[in-house]
Amino acid sequence: MPELARDFEVVAVDQRGMGLSDKPRDGYDAGTLAGDLVALMDVLGHERFAVVGHDTGYIIGHALAADHPERVDRVALAEIPGPPGVAPSPPLFVPDPINDRVWHIPFNRVDDELTERLVGGREDVFFGYEFAIQGGKKGLPDEVQRYYFDLFSDPDALRGSFGLYRAWGTTLAQNEQRKTTPLKMPVLGIGGAESWGERAGEGMKPAAEDVQSVVIPDTGHWVAEQAPEEMLAALTEFLAPYRENGGGLR
């Protein structure tokens, strides 16, 4: 991110319920989360901008581009196989490598605080397992994992981390409307070769007219942490026309 910020004004956001952002009890559907970002960019004075999202940021980035196309110049989305309900979802019974990447979604959707009761106090077990099975051969550095374990040890942060999944049904209904109008701006799908690979880009083709794909070798789900130089190169090339037109300049 510091390298990308040499050429662009970079706004790094913790989405609602995550990291250092507020953790309300509701408002975790993709439309509301996208609206949060538009409101933030209004405050910062950015009328038009490019969007980069990873994992849940893929879902939010798609919603942001679909709901507010006049604001988004181009969008790069990494490491899921398409927006829920737009791209075909994996079936319930899948081979182990796919199951490793999706099992947490129905688990995280369970309400009545069951997930919090099962995971609370065991954040290192739950999230450590996720980091390991989705990380490919490289995994995540211990200090990065510890940072996330500490964040999720806050009960409100843990609850907030499940919020997007518990609003999945609302987001699915929203995406039924979104997919009726394909995105017109350029879209880049980024996949880790040991994770979703080409499916990160393929999953956006039902939702957009201009989709490019990049697969980053020797990486699992955590492409930015595992291959920062390759990720930077992919983003810099994709964002170059935006910069040349005066967008995002420092």
Residue ranges of model-derived segments:
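Flexible "cap/lid" subdomain of the alpha/beta-hydrolase fold that forms the substrate-access gate
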Residues: 11, 18-52, 56-215, 224, ...
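Catalytic histidine-centered segment of alpha/beta-hydrolase-like enzymes
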Residues: 219-232
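Short amphipathic alpha-helix adjacent to the substrate-entry channel of hydrolases
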Residues: 1-9
